[in-house]
């Protein structure tokens, strides 16, 4: 079986290659950005016509931080729309039997109920700072739903929660909270600092899923005979930012103290995915946060030593 993994150079795509690369009956097909521009419709069409994969996982996306999303919303909307539309349509045209499109928890309304269920999609305004990216991901989800409805193809979507793991982005300004903490505490330990400052009260609660668990969930979903049109993927458990920070400090070996600045903003008090549907189907995350952080820190050190740190 030929499996095309779009976006294999990213954190998620890398985990998917690790997960499926060891299966004897699976031939993983992948292309670098230089080899295949997924925004280019003609190039994508030619690729599917030549390779004719049996299955596809769309993990490719143009991603960035709040500043980039706010400054270049047209680019984020256009590029991510093009990636979704080109891959989904060409997959349909060239006989792909199964396609899994990966979205994001940002598709749900800013003031969605917590935990966020799948059926709260399109029930309220989105978070303005990443609206363009979210709209593109919603469109990809709906394309899969409508191609399935109209043409009978088994195209479906998965919406993961906050992800972390090997190959993450550790940029000091543009990374997400968990990899940013890993880098900050590693550098503080190396510099012998006695104190690290943190924003806010530390009380907001967040959910984190190791990327290898996401890859396992994708394999599980691709084995289902009749999967939902879209489904949340997460741990179903949460941790305070304070608890996360203390765990990262311990894992990195930082011996100093953490000081909190309550004058700084906290952000949303809670953001958690409702994973009851996936649990009912028989899948649960296996990697707990402490274990996942230890694996992530080990990969961070290896990537840094090899000069391959994404930053």
Predicted regions: what they are:
Residues 129-133, 161-176, 200-212, 235-237:
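Glycine-rich "substrate-gating" loop/helix at the edge of Rossmann-like oxidoreductase active sites
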Residues 66, 101-116, 132-138, 149-150, ...:
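Conserved catalytic-site region of short-chain dehydrogenase/reductase
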Residues 6-7, 11, 15-19, 187-311:
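C-terminal substrate-binding subdomain of Rossmann-fold SDR/epimerase-dehydratase oxidoreductases
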Residues 81-87, 136-144, 178:
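Conserved catalytic Lys-bearing alpha helix of Rossmann-like short-chain dehydrogenase/reductases
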Residues 85-130, 156:
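Conserved Rossmann-fold NAD(P)-dependent oxidoreductase catalytic core, especially the SDR/UDP-sugar
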Residues 21-46:
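Adenosine-cofactor binding site in Rossmann-like domains, unifying the SAM/SAH pocket
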Residues 98, 103-104, 141-169, 179-182, ...:
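Conserved beta-loop-beta element that borders a ligand/cofactor-binding pocket
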Residues 41-81, 93:
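NAD(P)H-binding glycine-rich loop region in Rossmannoid oxidoreductase-like domains
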């Amino acid at each position: 079986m030929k499996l095309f993994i779009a976006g294999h150079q990213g954190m998620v795509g890398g985990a998917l290659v690790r997960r499926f690369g060891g299966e004897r009956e699976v031939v993983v097909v992948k292309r670098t950005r230089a080899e295949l521009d997924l925004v280019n419709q003609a190039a994508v069409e030619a690729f599917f016509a030549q390779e004719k994969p049996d299955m596809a996982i769309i993990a490719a996306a143009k991603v960035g931080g709040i500043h980039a999303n706010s400054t270049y919303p047209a680019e984020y909307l256009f590029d991510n729309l093009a990636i979704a539309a080109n891959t989904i349509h060409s997959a349909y045209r060239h006989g792909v039997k199964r396609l899994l499109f990966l979205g994001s928890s940002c598709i749900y309304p800013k003031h969605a109920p917590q935990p966020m269920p799948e059926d709260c999609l399109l029930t309220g305004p989105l978070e303005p700072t990443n609206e363009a990216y979210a709209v593109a991901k919603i469109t990809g989800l709906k394309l899969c739903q409508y191609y399935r409805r109209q043409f009978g193809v088994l195209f479906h979507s998965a919406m993961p929660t906050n992800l972390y793991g090997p190959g993450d982005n550790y940029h000091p300004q543009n990374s997400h909270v968990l990899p940013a903490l890993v880098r900050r505490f590693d550098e503080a330990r190396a510099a012998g600092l006695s104190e690290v400052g943190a924003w806010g009260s530390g009380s907001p609660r967040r959910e984190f899923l190791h990327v290898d668990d996401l890859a396992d969930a994708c394999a599980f979903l691709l084995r289902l005979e009749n999967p939902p049109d879209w489904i949340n993927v997460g741990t179903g458990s949460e941790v305070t930012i304070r608890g996360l920070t203390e765990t990262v400090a311990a894992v990195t070996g930082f011996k100093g103290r953490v000081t909190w600045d309550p004058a700084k903003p906290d952000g949303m008090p809670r953001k958690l995915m409702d994973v009851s549907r996936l649990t009912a189907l028989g899948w649960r995350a296996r990697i707990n946060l402490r274990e996942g952080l230890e694996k992530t820190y080990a990969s961070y050190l290896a990537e840094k030593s090899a000069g391959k740190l994404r930053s």
